[in-house]
């Protein structure tokens, strides 16, 4: 009798448990799969990672797959080919594609950062650093035509320094490999994103002497974009995606660097919590993140001015052709 009761109890428990996996499967199936290809995986993009880790994309019905493209050109290729529904990169790339005659051109719908996120790293501490110190130096720079390099050159020109004549900028090293090259002895200075800048400091081979974000002023550095056809066919997904990002932005703007670091730490398993906190603090103090995701027309004009100054603009593009603020405005309500 005892065995019979035990068997019945086990059977009852098993039967009761069956609906839960089924419900979980139904919930998972109801989420829309979206692939986001990001230009780099950096703490610079903390609001995005906060949105991922806090489940905001799932709340908006999105099963987000995050892929790192390691360069804006590669992100754009992924979006145009359909390998990614959404790209996260410097919006200058959308201008290049448009001017090259893309039929189904890629449109920006949300701006995440409003300052450059890279830093100038020297081989020794330079508390009295001046941009003139770069004259005659070898600097490990970024890809020609990319935002990191153009903003760097924009700052140089603001200080009456000719990027071609007054210093040597090495643009031959792949994105993501400059820190290793600098650590190995190449260059007098290097332009680095985080966590590479802090890693060089911890290694004792480099010292941050200037912030390109501070010295360049407010710049529409990185934004989210998708093919115009995809946005027309899936406005609900774009809106849900933007809503999730706005929640991430709200979280970052209302919490301390320590709290933010703890939330996004799973995204950076190779960095300890103290390092992540230091980097978040550095970005927060220079007013990196906007309060909303609206890509203003003045920002787009400034972006084209920077491209023009760098000699990378073949023709001005109308703001309304490559930017929509509809989704960001709705998310900010």
What is each model feature region?
Residues 42, 69-73, 88, 142, ...:
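Soluble non-cytosolic domains of exported or imported proteins
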Residues 49, 95, 153, 198, ...:
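Predominant activation on well-ordered alpha-helical scaffold segments within soluble catalytic domains
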Residues 84-88, 284-297, 327-333:
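Short amphipathic alpha-helical segments at helix boundaries and their inter-helical linkers
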Residues 301-333:
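Conserved C-terminal helix/tail region of periplasmic/extracytoplasmic solute-binding proteins
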Residues 232-313:
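Secondary-structure end/capping motifs
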Residues 1-33, 330-333:
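Short, low-complexity disordered leader/linker segments with a strong preference
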Residues 93, 124, 174-268:
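Pocket-lining segment of extracytoplasmic ligand-binding domains
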Residues 27-164, 168-172, 181, 188-194, ...:
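Short, glycine-/small- and polar/acidic-enriched structural segments
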